[in-house]
Structure formats: C-alpha cells, structure tokens
C-alpha cells in the first residue's frame, strides 16, 4: 500500500463514526426520554387519529432542526471549551449572559413544579387505586415526597446522579416493552371515530388547534436542550483542533439527527400504542384527572371486567411504579440544573458576583428552600399539568431552543452562512406558535 493510500485510510478511520459519537447519540436520546413523555400521548391522542398523524409528520423536523439550531449557536463561539453562556456573552455582552442565565433557570424551574404536581398525583392514584388505601391529605403527601427527595439530594447527590444515569435506559426499555405488550389490547375505537363529514379544522377542538397545542407538548417532550451545550463542547474538543469547525458542525448535526430519530421512533410508537389501547375519550379523562398516561393505563387495567390475565395485573402495578421512577429521575435531573441556575442568580444579584461573601453550602440551602417551597405550593394547588406545560414550560423552552438561535443567526457574523435557509422559517414558526399558547390559554 502506498503512502498516499495509507494516509487516506488513516483519515477515513479517524473521521468516521466513533464510539464517542454513539455514546453522545444515546446520551442526547436518554436526556429527552423522561417524565414529559408520559404526557405526550394524552395531548397527541386527545383529538383522535388525524391530529396525531400530523404530529407524526412534524415530530422529527421539530426535534432535529430546533436542536441543530441551538448546537450551531453553541459552536459559534471562539473558545472551543466555552459553554452557551460564554458564547452568548461573547456575541451580546454581559447583558446577554444575564438573559441566558435567566432563560436557563426559568426553562427548568417550571419543570420541577410540573414534576411536583405529577409525582403527587401519581403517588395518590397508586395509593388509592392499586393499593386500595384510604385517601390521604394532598398537602401532606406533597410535603412528604418533596422532603424525601430533599433528603436524598442533600445527603447523597453523587449516588443520586449515578442511580439516575443508570435508570435512563431501563426506563426507555420499559417504555418499549409496554408499547409492545399493549398490542394484544389494541382496538379500532380511534379509527371508528374518524368521520370525514364531521371533521373540523377550526374551532377549539378543531384539527388545527389540536396540532398547534400538540406542537408545544412536542417541544416539551422532545427536548434535550439542557445537554446540548456540554455535547457541543465535548465534540469541539474532540474534533475541531484536528478537522476544523465545519467538520465538527457536520458531525454534531449527524449525532443530533440520529438521536432525534431514535427519540421520535420510541415516543411516537408509545403514543400510538396507548391511543390504540385506549380512546380519545380516555385521553380526555386522563387530562381531567391530571395524571400521566401510565397511571391512567394502570387504572384502566384495574377496572377491567371479567378475569384479568397475569399480564394485565402486572401492568396495573408496573405502569404506576415505572411512572413514579420516571418522575423521580426527571425531578432529580432537573433539580441539579435549577440549583446551579438559582445559585448563579443569587450570587450575581445578592452578593454582586463575589464568591467570597457566601459559602457553597449556604447558597445550596437558600436555593433548596426556594425550590422545594415553591414546588410544594404548586403541587398543593394542583394546576392542570398539560395546561402548565403549554402555558409555561414549553414556551420558555421554545424561546431558548428556537428563537434565541434564530436571533443569533440574524445578528452574529459567525452564523451568517446559515441565514436565508428554509429550516430557519420552520424553527421560528415552531418557537412563535409555542409561545402564542400563552395568549391562547388567556382567552
């Protein structure tokens, strides 16, 4: 083999798909698959078969183009080791850094409130329906669960991180297993209800409004934005010095594309399996009861008439336990991000950025009291979870995931080559439609 051929073979090996690329693909995929996925089938199936088919068409473009836009923003900084906050400060100054810190905090903190409501409702429905125990006081249940999680966080954060990381893929496997196991219980109710003469495209329950609201729940459920900055830094340090920024951008796009495909395949299969097992009316009941779809499935199998199979009995209990584990996992993961963001805000505005004025322990205590206290208040109030996602969680995520990168592409010279592309209009539309949910909820 000639020297030229040896060089070509060597370059092909080094620039081809690496083990680290597979690891990050699974990491992005695992970050997105959490408790939010348990509400997607409810919103997607609420309007019947046609809206969920339209959401199926939109799911991959939303997941891929939005996260790729955020990754490109992270890639635009001059420092390969700089995170998104540093990159935004580089482009827009200190004010931009403060804005991104606020956005990150307010994108994650409402998710904790959502998970606080969810875990309270999931535990209470499991206690009353599966264990057949008398109803408990809601405030007491919420306080007990939050204190339990606070205890674990305070005394075993490192162990918690390891356990939560370990639980990611068993949870994904459980979702796939449940989706497959529901196939024998599929029925044609959702198909039978499709009537072309009764179809309505406008109005409160029309297809367009259902899909519009579905976009916000997709932004929420198909979201691995919290890890994109770390992912880009890792890939830049691995590839940029040797192969350049353009190659690194292409590699990041491929990884995001594969992670998005995995995510959409698993979540949409789970959603369709739930919809064919239940019905749009069942999804409406789940929304009214303010519980995740796994808890509703557990109650559904608990009320089955006649002789139940062993599988139905196992699913009745297993679905609730899997839901509880998923919510615990998501709560812990988002708590760490919220704590970091709130610590930064308290330090910046309470102590003028001087780390010598306050200890890390005191910062953590102040932040924990605020986070757990506000989460308990919301959990006790029990607002509708889907309404909270659509009016608060998803719009803030969309502003960070969709609109911030699009604004940067228009204003930052380093991103000028991405201007004028069709996908930019799509990402902007997704962001604006998600934020407009706030207006819709008000009226």
Swiss-Prot record:
Subcellular location: Cell inner membrane
Functional note: Involved in the import of threonine and serine into the cell, with the concomitant import of a proton (symport system).
NCBIfam families named in the record: PRK13629.1 (NF010152), stp (TIGR00814)
GO cellular component, as recorded: plasma membrane
Keyword check for Transport: yes
InterPro entries in the record: Amino_acid_transport_2, Hydroxy_aa_transpt, Thr/Ser_transpt_TdcC
Family listed: Belongs to the amino acid/polyamine transporter 2 family. SdaC/TdcC subfamily.
Transmembrane intervals: 22-42, 44-64, 97-117, 140-160, 163-183, 207-227, 259-279, 319-339, 366-386, 389-409, 423-443
Gene Ontology terms, MF aspect: L-serine transmembrane transporter activity; symporter activity; threonine efflux transmembrane transporter activity
Xref: PANTHER family: SERINE TRANSPORTER, THREONINE_SERINE TRANSPORTER TDCC
Membrane topology: Multi-pass membrane protein
Catalytic activity: L-threonine(in) + H(+)(in) = L-threonine(out) + H(+)(out); L-serine(in) + H(+)(in) = L-serine(out) + H(+)(out)
Name recorded for this polypeptide: Threonine/serine transporter TdcC
Family matches, as HAMAP family: Thr_Ser_transp_TdcC
Domain of life: Bacteria
Organism: Enterobacter sp. (strain 638)
Key words of the record: Amino-acid transport, Cell inner membrane, Cell membrane, Membrane, Symport, Transmembrane, Transmembrane helix, Transport
